[in-house]
Design a protein with these regions (language model features):
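Core AdoMet radical
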Residues: 121-136, 145-162, 172-210, 220-235, ...
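A short acidic (Asp/Glu
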Residues: 164-167, 189-190, 267
Length: 315
């Protein structure tokens, strides 16, 4: 696979070090003046953005933050109040720089030079039992993905999220979204999560979510929530009721996740509603529809709808 590999984004990267220094200082200042610090951070990010995705994302963010009453300021203030600076910095740099900047460039290069459609992220559901052999296999798969430019991972381990944490800890240059149930947040899991800076916990939004997010806040762990939905739930989604309930827990993202069998029509409606709600800044959380965001970012990064499964890329 050596001929397909690029230099890893973190190798002797002066640009990353300089950006990280500025971001750390701005995050520290954000606790005193979140509105001004966020605007500075977004303006700086837009100024140094090289790729299409970053320029589009930060351009939109810049326009949104012109509204001084934006609920996203309150979201940022709340997040910075409980999450450790190192966690925000590591996760943000892994996602924004390693994945969407340098990793995206590696993916585009592979597409242009070798016509290989590498996905920008991978969704992985952990099997049970997740023994040592399977952990090693997953770690090798992630290492392979990183060599191709994949530095964002969606890990689903609903009942035993602790099983994923050893592998996550072995890949500190990647950003991991760990989808799980509140019931899976054992004492061991919470302690290990608190030690890792490259993971965002994404809790299922259900009757236990309030207690689950309270545990995460107490440990200073970055979190979002997800809401599984089916075709029959579309009216409730379009009413905005789910997002109104979710924002009370102050999640960074509130993610709609279509269940198996959900119709394409329902998914498109959910995605359109989430995008409109995001653009209009309706809630103190960032509403997204999972599959549509994955697809849109992939399009922006590589312009390729036919992206190969990582397991099928030879190397």
């Amino acid at each position: 696979m050596r001929d397909m590999e690029g230099e890893k984004p973190m190798d002797h990267d002066v640009s990353r070090a300089l950006i990280e220094t500025v971001v750390r200082r701005t995050l520290t200042e954000m606790r005193a003046d979140p509105e001004r610090s966020i605007r500075i951070l977004v303006d700086m990010a837009l100024a140094v953005s090289k790729g299409r995705f970053q320029q589009r994302f930060f351009g939109i963010a810049q326009r949104m933050l012109e509204d001084e009453s934006s609920p996203y300021y309150r979201l940022a203030h709340d997040t910075i109040s409980y999450v450790d600076i190192d966690k925000l910095l590591r996760f943000g740099m892994n996602l924004g720089y390693n994945s969407c900047t340098e990793g995206a460039q590696m993916i585009r290069t592979l597409k242009m030079e070798k016509d290989i459609g590498v996905p920008w992220t991978q969704r992985i559901t952990l099997p049970e039992p997740f023994d040592d052999e399977r952990q090693e296999r997953l770690s090798r798969l992630i290492g392979k993905g990183e060599s191709l430019g994949i530095y964002t991972w969606m890990i689903f381990s609903e009942d035993r999220p602790v099983d994923a944490l050893h592998v996550i800890g072995d890949h500190l240059d990647s950003a991991f979204f760990l989808f799980c149930n509140s019931g899976g947040l054992s004492r061991e899991c919470l302690e290990r999560l608190s030690e890792l800076d490259n993971v965002m916990c994404v809790l299922r939004f259900d009757d236990e979510a309030e207690a689950g997010t309270a545990k995460l806040r107490k440990k200073g762990i970055l979190y979002s929530v997800y809401l599984p939905y089916s075709t029959g739930d579309i009216d409730q989604i379009l009413s905005g009721a789910w997002f109104e309930e979710a924002e009370a827990l102050s999640p960074v993202f509130t993610c709609l996740l279509a269940e198996k069998g959900c119709s394409e029509k329902a998914i498109k409606k959910a995605a359109a509603f989430a995008q409109t709600a995001l653009d209009e800044q309706r809630y103190r959380t960032l509403p997204v529809e999972f599959s549509s965001v994955i697809e849109e970012v992939g399009w922006i990064i590589s312009g390729d709808p036919e992206q190969a499964d990582l397991k099928n890329i030879k190397g």
